Amino acid sequence: MIDIHSHIVFDVDDGPKTLEESLSLIEESYRQGVRIIVSTSHRRKGMFETPEDIIFKNFSIVKHEAEKRFEHLQILYGGELYYTSDMLEKLKLKQIPTLNNTKFALIEFSMQTSWKDIHTALSNVLMLGITPVVAHIERYNSLENQKERVKEIINMGCYTQINSSHILKQKLFNDKHKRFKKRARYFLEENLVHFVASDMHNLDVRPPFLAEAYKIICRDFGKERANQLFIENAQSILKNHYI
């Protein structure tokens, strides 16, 4: 499998704190069958402002150690880019990364961002000649039960991603992700999803659930659809090809 959304680089955002934590997280992903991981550390003004050279330095250490330790594993460079006018300018100047240096970029918003602001932001990114992959679309309140809005995003030329943790079955009690899981299922049933990715941060609170999610998609939507969501679509964009 291929994971295009992950926080595996130590000491740069809210992901791993140490190299060993990075490697333990990658080991679990590898155990689940992932062989390509795109590292997408946060870039968010006012919250995650680690200098780009530090992120790349720590990424390079993680890549070297992980690829040495795990056979046939590839770690690629990217970023989860929180949309602001500052981010747009940095993207234009190539100061922050797309996914594996392609024309595709992982773009994030706050849960409360309005539909109008999401639409405007994505239009602005598209005008740079960059195709947005909208991170975890199930988290945005303005898209809840709004298949027409998500269709519009896709028709504009964007792609969509949901988190593997939100594909898992709802817990009977105290499932704080219940709302996200309902939204993710809705988008899957409406065929409005291009990628499932882990958005993994650590092994205790936000681990990868790709193996379990893959089984559920196979069971409910078929193996062909599962392979598109977990492997084939990601293969395309990482080679800089449209889906």
Curated annotation (Swiss-Prot):
The keyword Manganese applies. Its cofactor is Mn(2+). Keywords: Capsule biogenesis/degradation, Exopolysaccharide synthesis, Hydrolase, Manganese, Protein phosphatase. Its EC number is 3.1.3.48. The keyword Manganese applies. It catalyses: O-phospho-L-tyrosyl-[protein] + H2O = L-tyrosyl-[protein] + phosphate. One of its GO terms (molecular function) is manganese ion binding. GO terms for biological process: capsule polysaccharide biosynthetic process. Pathway: Capsule biogenesis; capsule polysaccharide biosynthesis. It is an enzyme of class 3 (hydrolase). Dephosphorylates CpsD. Involved in the regulation of capsular polysaccharide biosynthesis. Belongs to the metallo-dependent hydrolases superfamily. CpsB/CapC family. This is Tyrosine-protein phosphatase CpsB. It comes from Streptococcus agalactiae serotype III (strain NEM316).
